[in-house]
Amino acid sequence: MTNTAKILNFGRGNFAGQERNVADLDDGYARLSNMLLEAYSGADLTKRQFKVLLAILRKTYGWNKPMDRITDSQLSEITKLPVKRCNEAKLELVRMNIIKQQGGMFGPNKNISEWCIPQNEGKSPKTRDKTSLKLGDCYPSKQGDTKDTITKEKRKDYSSENSGESSDQPENDLSVVKPDAAIQSGSKWGTAEDLTAAEWMFDMVKTIAPSARKPNFAGWANDIRLMRERDGRNHRDMCVLFRWACQDNFWSGNVLSPAKLRDKWTQLEINRNKQQAGVTASKPKLDLTNTDWIYGVDLKTSPHRWLTLTVSRCVGSPTTCRNSTTKSRRYSR
């Protein structure tokens, strides 16, 4: 019996046809501080939130911008997540102050002490997604192990204060994400159309007050949404009446927000309709007993041979005018 051995050739194979995809700084890069990178690594975020966060970093720091207008479709293209899920994760990051929002612009918040990371409370990710996020515990203000946390002070929005129906949720329930919301801050939110109308109104305010401070657009959009859903107004009527108020001599300094527009809607509409009809609210009443108009009249130009002028004057009470005297005079040419 002869011992034979079969030699098998395990070569590296032919990889010449495969395209190598290697990252290179020449293709662009994002400058990120080590402190911020460590903070992101230690933040207890869901996989979806972290993917959206990285996408926002790419669209801002990747272009050397602190903030930029980022649509949900752009986030979906980078994260490979549905547009709706990207919107939900983005708004959650905004509520945690990890992402800043100014109108329709978004960007990373470099002030780590302002971050508010919710507690997971030992729940599974599937359960946690369906429950409310509690913002009681915030990101530590100092590095290292510490029990000191910074609680976020409640900011008072200067809109939606005109009534108790300013929002759809109680003040302490800040977690419910509205699927139709293009902007949301706590329980105040609005659709993309509401936000567009709010930005248009602020542009109108700046025409009469160029130094006006940028408002809380979530509160403005919330007031516009309430006018639309509860008062039955539409965006066109809101903008038309708001523009008239900004151009009116009296109302231009009194109606500078959607909340004020909603509060004064009836008065504004009445005054605008009177103005368009050519009727002013201060029109004097006609005095039927006033005969001052006769003075200075040249009676010789009358086409009649004789002109009889009868003047009735009230002798008794002005309200009753029961007793009266009548004087008749005859004038000739």
Swiss-Prot record:
Gene3D superfamilies: Winged helix-like DNA-binding domain superfamily/Winged helix DNA-binding domain (1.10.10.10). Residues 160-169 have a biased composition (Polar residues). The keyword DNA-binding applies. It comes from the Viruses. It comes from Escherichia phage lambda (Bacteriophage lambda). One of its GO terms (biological process) is DNA replication. Residues 123-132, 144-159 have a biased composition (Basic and acidic residues). Residues 117-181 are annotated as: Disordered. GO terms for molecular function: DNA binding. The lineage of its organism: Viruses, Duplodnaviria, Heunggongvirae, Uroviricota, Caudoviricetes. Necessary for the bidirectional replication of DNA. It interacts with the ori (origin of replication) region of the genome during the initiation of replication. Belongs to the phage O protein family. It holds the Pfam family Phage_rep_O. Keywords: DNA replication, DNA-binding. This is Replication protein O.
